[in-house]
Amino acid sequence: MSTFVAKDGTQIYFKDWGSGKPVLFSHGWLLDADMWEYQMEYLSSRGYRTIAFDRRGFGRSDQPWTGNDYDTFADDIAQLIEHLDLKEVTLVGFSMGGGDVARYIARHGSARVAGLVLLGAVTPLFGQKPDYPQGVPLDVFARFKTELLKDRAQFISDFNAPFYGINKGQVVSQGVQTQTLQIALLASLKATVDCVTAFAETDFRPDMAKIDVPTLVIHGDGDQIVPFETTGKVAAELIKGAELKVYKDAPHGFAVTHAQQLNEDLLAFLKR
């Protein structure tokens, strides 16, 4: 099993497929590197090296009590990039993982980065703030934490419906829903709850100004988890030269529901 050891001793799992120009994937909340298997197989079969890791506290990585914050997540990515000596890497972040890769560029620069892709990402700001009243009300996130601490398995099981848009007519197999629950339950409860605080409260607006590589923003306008109008749309406006693609009626989990469209768009961006 491929792992590296972070600066604080946390062991972090990653998978590394294929050869060619590298693409590094950062997963969403409740998930792990396995969420990317269809994108990784597609791109690695077409001449790219694809790498995905389990964020600390999730999947097969260690479960430290502390360090579940975006500066640490970004530093973990920096260490993985250095560990593998990646150059001209394209960073792809989904949901809270979009914050990981944006913060990486803000903290560590873009010398090793060829491009950035933000998929249904929480950037530039997910939660409400006095100067960002359009953000998601903080009591929504407080409820998430309360329900997770009461019955995590049921919360995640119920979360599948809005995540995949099943409650809006999207068709997702029972197998995928079961896999999502299984992946989510591998994670540390502490990390799962801490990450709610991280993605609800972290302001990435300063990070957006530091992004100086070609950027593709993809978001579904049917996203019930991370609303397009206050995240993806704004991020594309704040990042200089960003390209925006909006998937009509797509849910938050469009990497599953719109996998072929996403794969083709990723490949086109890599070939630009």
UniProtKB/Swiss-Prot annotation:
The lineage of its organism: Bacteria, Pseudomonadati, Pseudomonadota, Gammaproteobacteria, Pseudomonadales. PANTHER family: HYDROLASE, ALPHA/BETA FOLD FAMILY PROTEIN (PTHR43433), NON-HEME CHLOROPEROXIDASE-RELATED (PTHR43433:SF4). It is unlikely that perhydrolysis is the natural function of perhydrolases. Instead, perhydrolysis is probably an accidental (promiscuous) activity. Perhydrolysis is an important reaction that makes peroxycarboxylic acids, which are useful oxidants in organic chemistry, for lignin removal and pulp bleaching and for disinfecting wastewater and disinfecting equipment for food and medical applications. Perhydrolases were previously known as metal-free haloperoxidases. Keywords: Hydrolase, Oxidoreductase, Peroxidase. The active site is at 95, 223, 252. Belongs to the AB hydrolase superfamily. Bacterial non-heme haloperoxidase / perhydrolase family. It catalyses: a phenyl acetate + H2O = a phenol + acetate + H(+); peracetic acid + H2O = acetate + H2O2 + H(+); a percarboxylic acid + H2O = a carboxylate + H2O2 + H(+). Acetate binds at residues 29, 96. Pfam families: Abhydrolase_1. Its EC number is 3.1.1.2, 1.-.-.-. Optimum temperature is 70 degrees Celsius for esterase activity. It comes from Pseudomonas fluorescens. Dimer of trimers. This is Arylesterase. InterPro entries: AB_hydrolase, AB_hydrolase_1, AB_hydrolase_fold, Epox_hydrolase-like. GO terms for molecular function: arylesterase activity; peroxidase activity. It comes from the Bacteria. Optimum pH is above 9.0 for esterase activity. SUPFAM superfamilies: alpha/beta-Hydrolases. Residues 21-253 form the AB hydrolase-1 domain. Changing residue 30 to P: Shows faster acetyl-enzyme formation. Tenfold more efficient at hydrolysis than perhydrolysis with methyl acetate as substrate. 3-fold decrease in catalytic efficiency for hydrolase activity with methyl acetate as substrate. Changing residue 228 to I: 3-fold increase in esterase activity. No change in perhydrolase activity.
